[in-house]
Amino acid sequence: MSGNTGERPFADIITSIRYWVIHSITIPSLFIAGWLFVSTGLAYDVFGSPRPNEYFTENRQEVPLITGRFNSLEQVDEFTRSF
């Protein structure tokens, strides 16, 4: 015999009017907020990733590829100097 945790059954929660009143507002709001976060470019600023037009500059058109095992720090410094 299984015990009772005192929580409402999931079927009761998703069939209640109160659940859908709350979530009919919050789910679209989260979607719109995420879309604005990405479309305005704020995601690039917050996470520090380069924008699509900043991957290759006028000075550096090659892919920044680390090729040496023992001088990798020097190569990273060389790549970051171009920014």
From Swiss-Prot:
Q: Where are the transmembrane segments?
A: 21-35
Q: Which co-factors does it depend on?
A: heme b
Concerning Pfam families, the annotation shows: Cytochrom_B559 (PF00283), Cytochrom_B559a (PF00284)
Q: Which InterPro entries does the annotation name? A: PSII_cyt_b559_asu, PSII_cyt_b559_asu_sf, PSII_cyt_b559_CS, PSII_cyt_b559_N, PSII_cytb559_asu_lum
Q: Which UniProt keywords apply?
A: Chloroplast, Electron transport, Heme, Iron, Membrane, Metal-binding, Photosynthesis, Photosystem II, Plastid, Thylakoid, Transmembrane, Transmembrane helix, Transport
User: What domain of life?
Assistant: Eukaryota
Q: Which GO terms describe its cellular component?
A: chloroplast thylakoid membrane; photosystem II reaction center
The entry marks the following residues as binding heme, namely 23
* One BP annotation, GO: photosynthetic electron transport chain
| MF terms in GO | electron transfer activity; heme binding; iron ion binding
Q: Cofactor binding mode, per the note? A: With its partner (PsbF) binds heme. PSII binds additional chlorophylls, carotenoids and specific lipids.
Quick one: where is this thing mainly located? Answer: plastid
User: Can you list the disulfide-bonded cysteine pairs?
Assistant: none
Gene3D superfamilies recorded for this chain?
Photosystem II cytochrome b559, alpha subunit (1.20.5.860)
Q: Where in the cell is it found?
A: Plastid, Chloroplast thylakoid membrane
Q: How does it sit in the membrane?
A: Single-pass membrane protein
> What does the record note on quaternary structure?
Heterodimer of an alpha subunit and a beta subunit. PSII is composed of 1 copy each of membrane proteins PsbA, PsbB, PsbC, PsbD, PsbE, PsbF, PsbH, PsbI, PsbJ, PsbK, PsbL, PsbM, PsbT, PsbX, PsbY, PsbZ, Psb30/Ycf12, at least 3 peripheral proteins of the oxygen-evolving complex and a large number of cofactors. It forms dimeric complexes.
Q: Could you tell me what this protein does?
A: This b-type cytochrome is tightly associated with the reaction center of photosystem II (PSII). PSII is a light-driven water:plastoquinone oxidoreductase that uses light energy to abstract electrons from H(2)O, generating O(2) and a proton gradient subsequently used for ATP formation. It consists of a core antenna complex that captures photons, and an electron transfer chain that converts photonic excitation into a charge separation.
Q: Member of which family?
A: Belongs to the PsbE/PsbF family.
Protein known as:
Cytochrome b559 subunit alpha
Record the organism.
Anthoceros angustus
